[in-house]
């Protein structure tokens, strides 16, 4: 799904996977996930079908955001808990929409222009920022509401994109 902002000062593209993203987490103090599987997903992307992977470490736990293909490749562990919900990742892109281009300062204003209308409708989002782009994850079950809410401010184009 792609959205072009009418007043956002740039282009906002979103990428979603038909199967969505999963959010497994493991308590940091008892994490026994096999590092081999995580290293494969994170660094050996040519050896995996996973196209979206994020690992976040906090003092309390490790959180992994991974697409369905990557989720199936994760090692099993009794210490790994998985969120029941499936999330769709929307990618915020400014300007020409190239994933490899560097983003200008003020990207958060574009992300805010997407998040604010969703918050006004009580639609939950999960924000993930990287150096080059911002991802807004929405619950798969909320997609019709997200589309309806954003269609008043954005032109929505459906597409399948690769990361």
UniProtKB/Swiss-Prot annotation:
Domain of life, source organism: Eukaryota
Gene Ontology terms: cellular component: cytosol
GO BP annotation list: cellular response to L-arginine; negative regulation of TORC1 signaling
InterPro entries (alphabetical): ACT-like_dom_sf (IPR045865), CASTOR1_N (IPR040778), CASTOR_ACT_dom (IPR027795), CASTOR_fam (IPR026249), CASTOR_mTORC1 (IPR051719)
PANTHER family membership: CHROMOSOME 1, WHOLE GENOME SHOTGUN SEQUENCE, PROTEIN CASTOR3P-RELATED
Family stated for the protein in its record: Belongs to the GATS family.
Protein name: Putative protein CASTOR3P
Originating species: Homo sapiens
Higher taxonomy: Eukaryota, Metazoa, Chordata, Craniata, Vertebrata
Gene from which this protein is expressed: CASTOR3P
């Amino acid at each position: 799904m792609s959205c072009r902002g009418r007043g956002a000062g740039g282009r906002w593209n979103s990428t979603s996977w038909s199967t969505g993203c999963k959010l497994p987490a493991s308590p940091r103090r008892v994490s026994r996930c096999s590092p081999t599987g995580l290293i494969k997903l994170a660094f050996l992307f040519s050896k995996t079908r996973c196209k979206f992977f994020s690992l976040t470490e906090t003092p309390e736990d490790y959180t992994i955001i991974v697409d369905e293909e990557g989720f199936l490749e994760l090692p099993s562990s009794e210490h790994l808990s998985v969120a029941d919900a499936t999330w769709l990742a929307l990618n915020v892109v400014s300007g020409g929409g190239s994933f490899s281009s560097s983003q200008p300062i003020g990207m958060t204003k574009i992300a805010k222009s997407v998040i604010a209308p969703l918050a006004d409708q009580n639609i939950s989002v999960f924000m993930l920022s990287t150096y080059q782009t911002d991802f807004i994850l929405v619950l798969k079950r909320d997609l019709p509401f997200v589309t309806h809410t954003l269609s008043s401010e954005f032109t929505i184009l459906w597409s399948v994109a690769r990361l």
